[in-house]
């Protein structure tokens, strides 16, 4: 009889009404790193490192790029006959040049301050080509005989389309004095050149005068050129060389030319009608008939992520380049689902779950919440208010990081001439150093934010637990695993009052007091003495004691 009484008392305790505080868990295998830990499994995570591109050259915000194909910038501007498709070009978003374009300076030579000119082009979006000195205006000089087999067109000798190679006429080369006044409202890009013959015989054959010069002057330019006559190896079948120059002629300024030989005169100039962010990008890609906000030499990026690891050189509204291979931001909680335990026919609601033992996969409509068990049944209920606040907080954090990193900028490689190799090497080392620092900062930012996010979730669960504990006080017992065992009956209405913060402590305090006194000890008459048994709150302990007494 005593055994039956004791067993009945224990089972009654096991069936006491309970409420637990816990958090959401799922089948996610997403892992993040924090300052303190690596490979922490979380319920939700967001990759913030873009690793993909489309492998194409695209329009940038609806404006097509100027893809020079087999032409170089020099070949385009001077008018290499093989670059006729670029005689007139519309507005461009950026310029694409191959690493080694075939159609460059067809007549061998050099383009003075070429790298500086390219840098200038990275701030221009549109040229308008205008004629400044008509080719037919050179009545005292031959303007059509200045051609070369090095610049063929349709099987015949030709020359650059935008400049005129002036040759002697009737064995005379009168001194040239020409001026052009820029009456436009825009700046003007003006190009000209000088021919360096192979020997003195070629000099007099072309220009009659054995000693010649070219003078060029503007309000800011004072240049005097003389030909360098020397024996050279043949390039493109030519022993001679040409050297080209450029300047920006401001509105209302004039450019003055004077020469008695070797002069390559401008016929056309480029009116700079639109300035803006552009770039000259080295790429072998083809046009993909697509649109993007961010272009790299490897392809276009269409992403809202704040970082990418595709290529350090970009144009447009791009994520920041980092050298990292993985940047994952925690947005959810630590994911440690409880192990599913077999349910016995004993009226228990299953594994007691809490924020200490593990998360609940059964709670799918919130990050934090409750599990209750009473005579009416058991179930999960998310705490919508704390969940929504947490979602808003994490979302704002992610958006803030993205907004800070997604800024309009361009990072295109700078070009240096042969005399500036040490500067180029120093520049590369500095850029590599900046990338290393930025990569470190990005990785550290992610580690710190992940640590804060997981701590934030832990704190929210603890706050929810304290909210319940302060309401129940001594009307329930803390089981130490995120659960409370009521000392009174708590139906579904009572459970809801605990969840929404309206639990009426005085209403249940008397019933709870009597229950506490009832279970404070058990009288064991069979041995004629009384002992106080510690009643364990866990399911396993209760069942083990029941089996021992019954046996």
Swiss-Prot record:
It is a single-pass type I membrane protein. InterPro entries: Capsid_hemagglutn, Hemagglutn_HA1_a/b_dom_sf, Hemagglutn_influenz_A, Hemagglutn_influenz_A/B. The lineage of its organism: Viruses, Riboviria, Orthornavirae, Negarnaviricota, Polyploviricotina. This is Hemagglutinin. The keyword Glycoprotein applies. One of its GO terms (cellular component) is membrane. It comes from Influenza A virus (strain A/Hong Kong/212/2003 H5N1 genotype Z+). Palmitoylated. In natural infection, inactive HA is matured into HA1 and HA2 outside the cell by one or more trypsin-like, arginine-specific endoprotease secreted by the bronchial epithelial cells. One identified protease that may be involved in this process is secreted in lungs by club cells. Residues 17-530 are extracellular. Belongs to the influenza viruses hemagglutinin family. Homotrimer of disulfide-linked HA1-HA2.
């Amino acid at each position: 009889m005593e055994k039956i009484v004791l067993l009945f008392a224990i089972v009654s305790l096991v069936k006491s009404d309970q409420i637990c505080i816990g958090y959401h868990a799922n089948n996610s295998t997403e892992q993040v790193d924090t300052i303190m830990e690596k490979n922490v499994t979380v319920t939700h995570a967001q990759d913030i490192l873009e690793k993909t591109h489309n492998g194409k050259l695209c329009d940038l915000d609806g404006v097509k790029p100027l893809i020079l194909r087999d032409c170089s910038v020099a070949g385009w501007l001077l008018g290499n006959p093989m670059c006729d498709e670029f005689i007139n070009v519309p507005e461009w978003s950026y310029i694409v040049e191959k690493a080694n374009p075939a159609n460059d300076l067809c007549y061998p030579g050099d383009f003075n301050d070429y790298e500086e000119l390219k840098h200038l082009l990275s701030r221009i979006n549109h040229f308008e080509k205008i004629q400044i000195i008509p080719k037919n205006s050179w009545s005292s000089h031959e303007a059509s005989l200045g051609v070369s087999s090095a610049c063929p067109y349709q099987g015949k000798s030709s020359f650059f389309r935008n400049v005129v190679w002036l040759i002697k006429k009737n064995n005379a080369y009168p001194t040239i004095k020409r001026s052009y006044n820029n009456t436009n409202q825009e700046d003007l890009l003006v190009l000209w050149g000088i021919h360096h013959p192979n020997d003195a015989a070629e000099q007099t054959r072309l220009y009659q005068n054995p000693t010649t010069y070219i003078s060029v002057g503007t309000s800011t330019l004072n240049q005097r050129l003389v030909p360098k006559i020397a024996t050279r190896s043949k390039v493109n079948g030519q022993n001679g060389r040409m050297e080209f120059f450029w300047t920006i002629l401001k509105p209302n300024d004039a450019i003055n030319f004077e020469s008695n030989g070797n002069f390559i005169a401008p016929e056309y100039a480029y009116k700079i009608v639109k300035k803006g962010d552009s770039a000259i990008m080295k790429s072998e890609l083809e046009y993909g008939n697509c649109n993007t906000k961010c272009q790299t030499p490897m392809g276009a990026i269409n992403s809202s992520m704040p970082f990418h690891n595709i290529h350090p050189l970009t144009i447009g509204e791009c994520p920041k380049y980092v050298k990292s291979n993985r940047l994952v931001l925690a947005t959810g909680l630590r994911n440690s689902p409880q192990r599913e335990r077999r349910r016995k026919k004993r009226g228990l609601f299953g594994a007691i779950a809490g924020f200490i033992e593990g998360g609940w996969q059964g709670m799918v409509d919130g990050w934090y919440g409750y599990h209750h068990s009473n005579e009416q049944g058991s179930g999960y209920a998310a705490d919508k208010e704390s969940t929504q606040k947490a979602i808003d907080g994490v979302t704002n954090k992610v958006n803030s990081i993205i907004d800070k990193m997604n800024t309009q900028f361009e990072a295109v490689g700078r070009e240096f001439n042969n005399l500036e190799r040490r500067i180029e090497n120093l520049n590369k080392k500095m850029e590599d150093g900046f990338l290393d620092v930025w990569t470190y900062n990005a990785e550290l930012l992610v580690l710190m934010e992940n640590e804060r996010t997981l701590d934030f979730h832990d704190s929210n669960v603890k706050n929810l637990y304290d909210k319940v504990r302060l309401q129940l006080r001594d009307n329930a017992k803390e089981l130490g695993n995120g659960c409370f065992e009521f000392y009174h009956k708590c139906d579904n209405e009572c459970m809801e009052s605990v969840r929404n913060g309206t639990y009426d402590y005085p209403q249940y305090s008397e019933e709870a007091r009597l229950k506490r006194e009832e279970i404070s000890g058990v009288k064991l008459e069979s041995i004629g003495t009384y002992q106080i048994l510690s009643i364990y709150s866990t399911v396993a302990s209760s069942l083990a004691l029941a089996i021992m007494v019954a046996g």
